[in-house]
């Protein structure tokens, strides 16, 4: 009996996630950014796909002076709190897998000091970032469980 309830719970969660995804409108600029220009809509590991999609923008940003790069990252964090909150609210789900703006910004922070021509370091940064994002070591796990809304999405 428990197995059936568990299967039903999984089916209900999957159905709810699909309903939430249908509430997205890529014509809405907040939704477009929150989904990483649509990369978060990947049916296969959207966080990983979103992290990969952040790399071309990082490459362009990597040629900026460090001060301007840092300013763009800080603005992206501030804007991200709002756009992730609004998109999650519109979807009716907190931190839906398709919301990957936090992965974009996290990758930009991870790769900030890496020269654009050091692709082995970019690959290593990607792997470390994804491992930490999936594992969520303390204190990130605490924030993930206790901080809600756009701030919770961005900080995890």
List the predicted regions and their residue ranges.
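Interhelical loop and helix-boundary elements at the membrane-water interface
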Residues: 2-52, 82-109, 131-155
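Hydrophobic alpha-helical transmembrane segments
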Residues: 33, 48-53, 67-74, 100, ...
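Short helix-loop boundary/capping segments at the starts of domains
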Residues: 39, 58, 62-66, 80, ...
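Alpha-helical transmembrane segments of multi-pass membrane proteins
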Residues: 58, 73-82, 106, 111-112, ...
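Helix-coil boundary and interhelical linker segments in multi-pass alpha-helical membrane proteins
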Residues: 58-71, 110-122
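Hydrophobic, well-ordered secondary-structure segments
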Residues: 70-77, 81-90, 116-118, 125, ...
